[in-house]
Amino acid sequence: AIASGSWATDIKHILRNANALDMVPAILGKESAKREKPFPDIFLNAAKKLGIAPAECFVLEDALKGLNAANEAGIPCIILQNELNRNIDFKNAEMVFPSLADFVSALES
């Protein structure tokens, strides 16, 4: 699932352009939660929509407020670093990867 602070229509547009819309079983945008991150609502809603316990999910994030939301939801959080967040201390993350490419490489190995 994708649970994002962006609007669901924008997420679907991006996925459609990448021919990846059918790969995602659930898309939750900012309109699907009463409160935005750092509150856990959107992540808890995603787990509920998938029919699985939050602890059986994981969150990919690049922001501290997303990490805090995942922690509050009881969902392990993996941080993907980028130029904007490299100096942030993500000490409460389950794992931190220097890039999306490094995360993908770890999945493939």
Go through each PLM region and give its residues.
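Asp-based, Mg2+/Mn2+-dependent phosphohydrolase catalytic module
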Residues: A8, K12-S109
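Conserved phosphate-coupling serine/threonine residues in phosphotransfer and NTP-handling enzymes
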Residues: S4-S6
